[in-house]
Amino acid sequence: MHGAWCVVAIGVAACAAPKRPPGDPEAEVGVMLRRSAADWNRGDLEGFMSDYARDSLTSYLRRGHVQYGWQALHDHYQADYFAAGKHRDSLTFEEVRVRPLTMDLAYATARFLLHRGDSLVASGPFTLILQKRGERWQILHDHTSPDPKP
């Protein structure tokens, strides 16, 4: 009888354990962010934007303003960073942490750094809500908070 209770207890514990998505979300999102920075640094807006979910509910929150829709976000980046004659600083990410929430949802926190030559010109923390769509993690929501200027 004691053995039966052990089997039941193990079964209950297994059912209660959170389900992890297949693969390694932390590594996959890390690869996505490195590719995203490389696209940015090459001037490839379409590549950079391919990591955002291409729909009207994709959201971007920065400095108290929420922008909705992939196209609106694309247009913002095009006008502010990728237009002819605009200077675009070199982008890197650090302190990337990813937490799976469900089989196909995760959130990530990290810091962005923008350098112009050897000078840091902007930085700050951000949070991403991501969804696995097919083989790719895509950004549903991006909340970026630039650090105050010194």
Spans of model-derived segments:
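Surface-exposed, charged secondary-structure patches
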Residues: 72-120
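A short gly/proline-enriched turn/hairpin at secondary-structure junctions
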Residues: 57-68, 82-86
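Bacterial N-terminal signal peptides
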Residues: 2-13
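A mature extracytoplasmic/lumenal domain signature
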Residues: 52-53, 64, 97, 110-112, ...
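Short, low-complexity N-terminal intrinsically disordered segments enriched in polar/charged residues
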Residues: 14-51, 150
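Short beta-strand edge/turn micro-motifs at domain boundaries
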Residues: 17-18, 123-150
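Hydrophobic pocket/interface hotspot
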Residues: 36, 48-49, 56-58, 69, ...
